[in-house]
Amino acid sequence: MTACGNPSDEDSQEALQMQQSDSETTPETVTQQPEAANMETGVIAEQILSGNEGDIHYNYYLPENYDENKAYPLMMTMPGYDRMWFGEDSSGSNLEWSGFRVWTELPEDMIVVSAQLTDWHETSARQAVELTEYFIQNFSVDKSRVYAAGYSAGGETMSKAVAMRPDLYAAYLHGASQWDGTYDPIAENGVA
């Protein structure tokens, strides 16, 4: 890392290898969860995805009129340090965060996800990508409208995640944080 937080060539190479290997395994079609007709809507709290890098704690919002036959925008939100996963006592603390709630209150229906990760480094960035892919594969998501937003430590995590997989995200809102990801893959893939 340089003093400005730009990754070394080694970090860029790792991100490129991950992007290439991930893009080979990511399906191109929208798939839904098998029980979509019985799916709970509104805010769904305290979920755990057993991921390749360990458990991913998250909460999400499905529009009240969620329809498996309609493709929805997906917003991946990443809170700052005070809303990260520190054990059961912190479970669901990101639901109180306005960076999650504001997206659920927009007039347009969208799926909103807020992860509670354990750090803001490479592992959490890979978990953020894995969680994004999980929602794309298991919910009715418009793959051309996958967005991300990160604040503070969550901004550091999402800047790395978006740099790892710029093909996954259409746009990224980076707030109150240093940029830890690389710029080139983002510019090359037209991420707004």
For the regions a language model picked out, list residue spans one by one.
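Extracellular/periplasmic catalytic domains that process cell-envelope and extracellular macromolecules
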Residues: 51-53, 67-71, 104-108, 140-141, ...
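Extracytoplasmic/secreted cell-surface and envelope-processing proteins
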Residues: 85-86, 121-124, 156-159, 179-185
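Gly/Ser-rich "nucleophile elbow"/oxyanion-hole loop immediately N-terminal to the catalytic nucleophile
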Residues: 65-66, 70, 120-152
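Cell-envelope and extracellular/periplasmic
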Residues: 77-85, 136-141, 151-165, 176-177, ...
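A domain-start/cap signature at the N-terminus of enzymes
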Residues: 4-72, 149, 153-156, 160-161, ...
